[in-house]
Amino acid sequence: WPAIKQQLQAQLGAKLDDLTIDHEPLGTASLAQVHRATRKSDGLELVLKIQYPGVADAIDSDMSLFRNMLKLTRMVPQTREFDQWFDEVREMMHREVNYQIEAETTRRFAARLKDDPRYIVPQIVDEYCSDQVLCMTFERGVPINSPVMLSLPQERRNQLGEASLEIAVREVFEWGEMQTDPNFGNYLVRLGNGEDIHDKIVLLDFGAIRQFDQHLLTVARNLIKAGYYHDPQMMVNAMTGYEFFDSIPESIKPDMAKVFLLATEAFSHLDNNRDLPAGVMDEQSRYDWKKSQLH
């Protein structure tokens, strides 16, 4: 806590006196620490994401050191693809410590979902934000993997699952940017009462949201469409034009298409996919992940 307090004082100055901050973190990670806080003037509950001192400045040197280690040990072939991947990781690391970008992304998603009662996005509180501190409203909820979630009726769990998948599909087909770190820690569920108050998904962390170029988005959309229609040739065609797939021998592509069709089985329409295993669809023609072979 002393190091975190010193960082807060350096970043927020006198504004820090406005807040009562819990010394125990809500969560810790390699780049930052999250603390709960309360604004004294009105009792507003907040969350402060506090970047560790020196993290942003160390990214390039640490990444270069890691890259040299890989070269010396020859653990990874030194190819153009590796260079592209490494530069991509470096760029993503810099984005994750750029709290201005994360604040803007959070606002963008909040605006998109503000009229949808199934989702909650924290509100950014600019007054207590800086280059290395991100402040937002505290949003209550239970973890995705909480035993409470397992005790929910199946229909409520289905609705939460559908809402989660809908976000992913809209990211690809509508918004053109995706959450590239969809781990359970980035989500909570605010439970309703099963009647007039519905369950809501709380979206917490937008630091790993990545925008994709139109070409890659077109490839991804066509792959998903091919899965929906469960069409092997359509799947092969969807692969064409993307460097990774174009480098694969033509003789292998049909087999790879079969793998992709299996991976997108849950998105295929029953009328298009006669290969669906028996019992994998429920009485309402919905895909039952628990009975599938995909998990």
Regions found by a protein language model. Name each.
Residues 1-145:
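Conserved ATP-binding subdomain of kinase catalytic cores across diverse folds
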Residues 35, 179, 183:
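Histidine-centered active-site/metal-ligand motif
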Residues 44, 132, 176-178, 200:
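The start of beta-strands in P-loop NTPase/AAA+ ATPase cores
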Residues 67-74, 168-173, 228:
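Short amphipathic alpha-helical signal-transduction/dimerization elements
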Residues 75-79, 98-99, 115-119, 173-177, ...:
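Intrinsically disordered or highly flexible coil/loop and linker segments, enriched in small
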Residues 109-116, 151-180, 193:
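Conserved kinase catalytic-core helix
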Residues 130, 139-143, 147-163, 190-295:
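Helix-rich C-lobe and terminal helical cap/extension of kinase-like folds
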Residues 185-189:
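Hydrophobic residue at the +6 position relative to the catalytic HRD Asp in the kinase catalytic loop
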